[in-house]
Structures are given as C-alpha cells and as structure tokens.
Regions:
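A short, charge-rich alpha-helical start-of-domain segment used by transcription regulators
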Residues: 7-31
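Amphipathic alpha-helical segment used for protein-protein interaction
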Residues: 12-15, 106-139, 144-146, 153, ...
Length: 184
C-alpha cells in the first residue's frame, strides 16, 4: 500500500492504518529503536508507541512521506527512552549525542521554530553536498546511531579512517552552520 493511502486511512480514523504501517515500516522502526536501545523488548515497545504517536498526530498532520515521519517519531521516542534508562550509564548513543552536540546550536534563542526550520534546510543542503559514501556514513552514525566499528566493517574501512571522516565532516558542518549565522 502506498504512503498516501495509509495516511488517508489515518485521516479516516481506520484502525487498519496501524496494521498497514506495521506491515510496511515495522522492521524499519524496529531497526531504529534497536540501534538506540540495544534491547529487543524495549525496541518492540518503542515501535508500538510509535504507532500510537502516529495515530495521535495524524490528523492534524498530513505527512507527504510516511517513512521519514514514523522514523522521526520512533527515533525521538527511542532517544527519550534511552535518556530515561541511562542517566548514569554511557553507551553508543551517548557518544553519538556528544559528538553531534559540539556542532549544533545550543542556546534557546537558536531553537525557536523558525530557526529549527532553517536549521533543517541547512542540514539537508549540507548533506546533499557531501559525496554519497560520506553522506551515508554520517547519516548512519548520527541518525541510526551505528557504531564506528559497524561502519568500518560495512564500508571496508579502518575504524580510524571512519572516525577521521566523521570528525572532518562534523567540522565542515560546524563551519557551514557558522557561515549561516548559527552560534555553535
């Protein structure tokens, strides 16, 4: 079933919308949640919460593409769960968040709605300008929380080369955001 048809089911308040979402994007959402939480049961719970949150937000929202929409909801729910579970512990997600936090705007004035939209556009433009391999590695690290070791294995690179590529890409992103007026 196409995304538009599934969104229409949500808008009609048809419970089959959840079943269709699960059929089409269940494994995708589980992958996102599992990468962050590293626990199958917790990931399943987050995926179910994702369906509920999607049900609660459509309507009023009407996403053009359902995959990034449910992916974003799932990722945010998983990050929230991770934060609750690991207030004292350090893990892969904490490392990822620390790495990316260095280059994202941090004060409240930079995080109003308009700035958030502008930042989203800047990030998308930045990512589009990267070579395909670099873009894929960057997204896998900072969206899916893949470890440097996983990325090195998948892309047939040394871990040190992946770490350096990520560092250089973060530095380029930081420079790009500063040129556009964001305080980082």
């Amino acid at each position: 079933m196409k995304d538009k048809q599934i969104v229409d089911l949500y808008l009609e308040r048809s419970e089959s919308a959840i079943a269709e979402t699960e059929k089409k994007y269940g494994r995708y959402c589980h992958y996102i949640a599992y990468q962050i939480l590293e626990n199958d049961e917790d990931a399943k719970e987050i995926v179910n919460d994702t369906y509920l949150k999607t049900w609660q937000t459509i309507p009023p929202k009407r996403p053009e593409s359902l995959k990034p929409y449910v992916g974003m909801i799932c990722r945010q729910l998983a990050l929230n769960a991770y934060e609750e579970q690991h207030t004292q512990k350090r893990g892969q997600v904490a490392l990822v968040l620390d790495e990316i936090a260095e280059i994202l705007p941090g004060n409240d004035e930079d995080w109003d709605v308009v700035s958030g939209i502008v930042l989203n556009d800047l990030l998308n433009n930045f990512l589009r300008g990267l070579p395909q391999k670099t873009r894929n590695i960057f997204i896998r690290r900072y969206w899916y929380a893949s470890s440097v070791a996983e990325l090195a294995k998948e892309y047939s690179m040394k871990e040190s080369a992946v770490a350096m590529l990520l560092l250089r890409t973060r530095n380029k992103l930081k420079t790009h955001l500063q040129k556009e007026g964001f305080n980082v």
